[in-house]
Curated annotation (Swiss-Prot):
Belongs to the 4Fe4S bacterial-type ferredoxin family. RnfB subfamily. Residues 32-90 form the 4Fe-4S domain. This is Ion-translocating oxidoreductase complex subunit B. The gene is rnfB. [4Fe-4S] cluster 2 binds at C114, C117, C120, C154. PANTHER family: ION-TRANSLOCATING OXIDOREDUCTASE COMPLEX SUBUNIT B (PTHR42859:SF3), OXIDOREDUCTASE (PTHR42859). Its cofactor is [4Fe-4S] cluster.
Length: 198
């Protein structure tokens, strides 16, 4: 047998042995995740902005499962608080952040002042800033969550948080406040009223 064939067989046997060991270890030492943490994490907006005081949505979900307040997520707003309250079986709380008076904002980079240091790119938790080293950076407006984590690291202060223009696309439609009436029920109610008058 040639040495190349022996080497290939030896590598295949070693790969099979190590694969079996890894397969056994993954079954034997499997760590079960808490299903409530997964459910909470699915409700959170996944912006990873850190405004709640945790480094991301998953650590905040774990903290909520361990009894932390459900009202610390500004990007999620009151709707997320209500969903979390429903899931956890508690009363919805007011947001820990003043959501009503806070105007939604997005980052804006004054490109004539940008030196391309990439510090804002590294700070952005949602990858809403694009640009290369020593090149002008810009913000993808639709991706920006307005967390303002990119403002502090900028050495030239070229990043500004500007209010989001309200358009029909960005307006928060309060469709739940509009009463929905089933037409067939309304028609039968009207017929019953007409019959009772006769």
């Amino acid at each position: 047998m040639s040495t190349i064939l022996i080497a290939i067989i030896a590598l295949a046997v070693l790969a099979a042995i190590f694969g079996a060991i890894l397969g056994f270890a993954s079954i034997r030492f499997k760590v079960e995740a808490d299903p409530i943490v997964d459910q909470i994490d699915a409700i959170l907006p996944q912006t990873q902005c850190g405004q709640c005081g945790y480094p991301g949505c998953r650590p905040y979900a774990e903290a909520i499962a361990n009894g932390d307040n459900i009202n610390k997520c500004p990007p999620g707003g009151q709707a997320t608080i209500e969903k979390l309250a429903d899931l956890m079986g508690v009363e919805p709380e007011e947001s820990a952040h003043d959501l009503d008076s806070k105007v939604p904002t997005v980052a804006f980079i004054h490109e004539d002042m940008c030196i391309g240091c990439t510090k804002c790119i590294q700070a952005c938790p949602v990858d809403a800033i694009v640009g290369g080293t020593k090149a002008v950076h810009t913000v993808i407006k639709d991706e920006c969550t307005g967390c303002d984590l990119c403002v502090a690291p900028c050495p030239t202060d070229c990043i500004e948080m500007i209010p989001v223009e309200t358009t029909t696309d960005s307006w928060k439609w309060q469709l739940n406040a509009i009463p929905v009436v089933n037409i067939t029920d309304a028609a039968s109610d009207a017929a019953n009223v007409k019959d009772s008058i006769k």
